[in-house]
């Protein structure tokens, strides 16, 4: 028991939802399981010209394009914080270290934007003073996932994912929205990989790789 407690103390503050090293590797992408975007689109009618400014390998873009949305997207090759073009809608899983700056920029160039962030992002005095009390471009809705989604894994086409230890939510900011923010839930339970299912999928993946080996 003492050993387990010591292990927990060592891991305290690390991002459980990405990997168990606590460090973000240069090759880490923190990709968004397809189902997280699909569930949002079941609740929100996204319109107008769309931008995804932190697309990584294109997980969010793939879902939107599959549904017929036309959009612009980029990643590190362009600095979103210097963007001047106006877009009606922005949807992204922003780099957490730049989330505050991304929010400020999105308010300058869009009418509505959707950011995937940890639920704990609601906490903080600076955010309260500069983000949550903004009446001209307020937070309108928060969509909280009922199960903790694990980000950063290799994505599955069926949208299923493992569970992590970080609560995530879609935050929706809407220009000129009136009223208090509304909290809603997105039930992602059907997309959670069950233990046996994950084991079988792992075996299938190994077999596929072995079949592709040139022996």
Regions found by a protein language model. Give the residues of each.
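Class I S-adenosyl-L-methionine-dependent methyltransferase catalytic core
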Residues: 1-215
């Amino acid at each position: 028991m003492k050993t387990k407690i010591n292990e927990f103390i060592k891991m305290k503050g690390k991002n459980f939802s990405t990997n168990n090293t606590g460090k973000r590797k240069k090759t880490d992408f923190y990709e968004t399981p397809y189902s997280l975007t699909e569930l949002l689109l079941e609740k929100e009618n996204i319109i107008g010209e769309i931008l995804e400014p932190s697309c990584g390998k294109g997980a969010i873009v793939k879902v939107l394009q599959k549904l017929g949305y036309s959009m612009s997207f980029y990643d590190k090759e362009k600095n979103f914080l210097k963007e001047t073009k106006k877009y009606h809608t922005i949807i992204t899983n922003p780099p957490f270290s730049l989330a505050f700056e991304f929010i400020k920029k999105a308010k300058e160039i869009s009418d509505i934007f959707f950011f995937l962030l940890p639920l704990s992002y609601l906490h903080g005095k600076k955010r309260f003073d500069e983000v949550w009390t903004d009446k001209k471009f307020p937070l309108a809705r928060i969509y909280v996932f009922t199960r903790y989604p694990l980000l950063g894994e290799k994505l599955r086409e069926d949208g299923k994912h493992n569970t992590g230890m970080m609560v995530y939510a879609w935050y929706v900011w809407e220009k000129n929205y009136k009223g208090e923010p509304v909290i809603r839930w997105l039930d992602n339970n059907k997309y959670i990989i069950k233990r046996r299912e994950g084991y079988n999928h792992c075996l299938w993946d190994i077999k596929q790789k072995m079949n592709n080996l040139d022996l």
